[in-house]
């Protein structure tokens, strides 16, 4: 018994692009209250989002028979998830000084504004992702999955 792969683009479903719905929603809610003033803080939350993803199906491992999973490669979720992950990476863009050990007042003000802008961007992307998940976008269950990629059983003997 296995999935009947008929198109090369079907291999994407076997990658680590799935998340459990409740932990994903909880992570969004939790992340909205985080402080993003340091790159280490942004990296931590980015890693928490990345850690939610896993593989749940393989060519010979069937989609779970109960519940839904978030498919982050869905047309609605993918651009939001990618934008969120990109918004966390502000390394080397926050403070750019001519002499790193003694930034000028304007460089410090500029860096502060960039941190504030990064925080707004991160929270905005999290809220957009949370809204779409709350509206039921990006979820798949076994029936929906197997409409795309049929499960074949061995012939009866």
Swiss-Prot record:
Positions where N-acetylserine occurs in the chain: 2
Cellular compartments annotated: Virion
Keyword Membrane: no
Gene Ontology cellular-component terms listed: helical viral capsid
SUPFAM superfamilies: TMV-like viral coat proteins (SSF47195)
Similarity-based family: Belongs to the virgaviridae capsid protein family.
Gene3D superfamilies to which the protein is assigned, alphabetical: Tobacco mosaic virus-like, coat protein
Record function comment: Capsid protein self-assembles to form rod-shaped virions about 18 nm in diameter with a central canal enclosing the viral genomic RNA.
Protein name: Capsid protein
Keywords recorded for this protein, A-Z: Acetylation, Capsid protein, Helical capsid protein, Virion
Source species: Ribgrass mosaic virus (strain Hr) (RMV)
Gene Ontology molecular-function annotations: structural molecule activity
